[in-house]
Amino acid sequence: MIQHFHRMISAALGISEKQIVQTLGLLNDGATIPFISRYRKEVTGGLDEVQIESIKTHYEKLNEIAKRKETILNTIQEQGKLTAELQKRIEETWDNTLLEDIYLPYKPKRKTRAEAARQKGLEPLATLLMLQRDPHPEERAANYVKGDVKNVEDALKGARDIIAEHVSEDERARNSVRNAFARQGILTAKVVKGKEEEATKYRDYFDCSESLKRCNSHRLLAIRRAEAEGLLKVSISPDDEECVERLERQFVRSNNPCGQQVAEAVQDSYKRLLKPSIETEFATQSKERADEEAIKVFAENLRQLLLASPLGQKRVMGIDPGFRTGCKVVCLDAQGNLLHNENIYPHPPVSKQKEAFAKLQMMIESYKIDAVAIGNGTASRETEEFLKHQRFNRDIQIFIVSEQGASIYSASKIARDEFPDYDVTVRGAVSIGRRLMDPLAELVKIDPKSIGVGQYQHDVDQTKLKKSLDQTVENCVNLVGVNLNTASSHLLTYISGLGPQLAQNIVNYRAENGAFTSRKELMKVPRMGAKAFEQCAGFLRIPQAKNPLDNTAVHPESYCIVEQMAKDLGCSVAELIANRELRLKINPERYLSPTVGMPTLKDILQELDKPGRDPRGPIKIFEFDKNVRTISDPVSYTHLTLPTIYS
């Protein structure tokens, strides 16, 4: 079965079967996606994080189907209805929808009209009607009038109920209706009578009708949200007449009275059983598709936000702007520690601009501020203009920073633990300042869903959303790497192979023993085993370490290669890193081995060229257009300018 999995995943993703086998082997051995994509390129054939995640997801889905098949086979076996042919069909089916169609006739049911008719002994009559040969079905039905069957029509109705259920469980019939939904399904939304005023924000959908397959994700999610709130009635429907005609061509083989009874049962089956069942199926599928697209957008937006360029270790002033309540100002040192906090009131209704300037001047000089981070909320633009019109004794850069989620952070346990003696306004301003210094390190403290970079985030599948966002954060943190001696436990948690417990153990060890001096010292951390060390070491940096490789992305398992390169050139590792001319003399082919290929050697040489390089690049300043004050102000869009920098 496992080999069959490999073939199916290979066909679905267009990745060789060998790569699938090797990648799954690493995943099953406990390797993380960031580790595999960075340090096992020879094994996977150079697969990236997205491809590895896709392999993992497909494998998990196939495992779920395999477990479902086992349950289905056991259930049918217990009923004594499992034939060799049926077992073969189930074992060969890997499409979940088709699998459930096969199982449907055997699936334990609640009390249905058909089941009630069977209990009245009407199944033989239903079989007779389905043959469509007898010209007098009423006469045959009269033989069943006894007990709970009160009259001929009652008998015929029960027989039709049995036929209707048979039609609804027929694979060909279900596929026929399913194909109609796929080709021509129309999504219709109408406002619930009497809810017009309450549903004003959904007025675009009050009388909406469009092709389901062309309905984009944000419209579908909006419609489904309104439906959940009881404001819209939503339905999906194909061409009903065409569907019934197709079903009649399949099941009605005569125009005699028996055929007419079957035709009536087919119409009832479509309206009462088949159409609602397939409609539910398509409602679920379309919601899943919309969720997938929305989650993808959310993850990509989050990735861009997390990988925004950092200002670095500079002294920063963070400002949470406001009008009536004033602006909360904090001063941070180069490590992000809080030095001072103050309130200023440069805007109406208080408008103490001279006093505000004096306080800012004092703080900028006293704490040697290099840059100012202004939150992009209320009074952001006015605060930026106020600052830019002042003459300070130091040159400072002014940045607009996203404050989304800062209020949630400021009230969180993390913030209370960091600043137990300060209120939420100070904590929020600190978060704004730190986001400029290192957005990644600060934003990992906030639930990604609270950062507000996704559409309809509360309407999509929360389990899938969390999984995607957590993986995005993990990928970003490991792409950048972290300083082992300054990283918070929240940041370390996302490092490959660690998790919350080991991350906290590292912080505790650091507090008790001082700064780490080498990566090897990680092995002294409680519960740090060889596997965890292998997974995390390459993503942890130690500036000023005795071994300069400890501050690079070169994995400890490859140190011997660099040491051999240095030895061959008659220099030290430090000299090799510092001297480009020496590095140009290296012929990587000399260091190839059965376990070390050219991808790893290229990564090593690239890292030696720029050890500890930050992939996020240098920070840039974006400014508001001074000519734009309101939505009605004319603008010449010769090029797109961004109003904020998300740092």
What are these regions (language model features)?
Residues A180-G185, I319-F323, G377-E382, V401-A406, ...:
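A glycine-rich phosphate-binding loop feature that marks nucleotide/adenosyl-phosphate handling sites
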Residues I52-E64, M523-E563, E589-G597:
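Alpha-helical interaction/regulatory segments in DNA maintenance proteins
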Residues T75, E100-I102, G230-D239, S254, ...:
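Structured, non-catalytic alpha/beta "coupling" segments that mediate domain-domain communication
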Residues Q51-S54, K61, I65-G318, G322-Y422, ...:
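Duplex nucleic acid-engaging cores and interfaces of nucleic-acid transaction enzymes
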Residues I20, T57, I344-P348, A371, ...:
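Short beta-alpha connecting loops at secondary-structure transitions
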Residues K67, T75, T425-V426, V430-A515, ...:
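Long, highly charged, low-complexity intrinsically disordered interaction regions
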Residues H639-Y646:
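Single conserved hydrophobic/aromatic residue that forms the stacking wall/gate
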Residues I621-Y637:
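Short boundary/loop segments of OB/S1/cold-shock single-stranded nucleic-acid-binding domains
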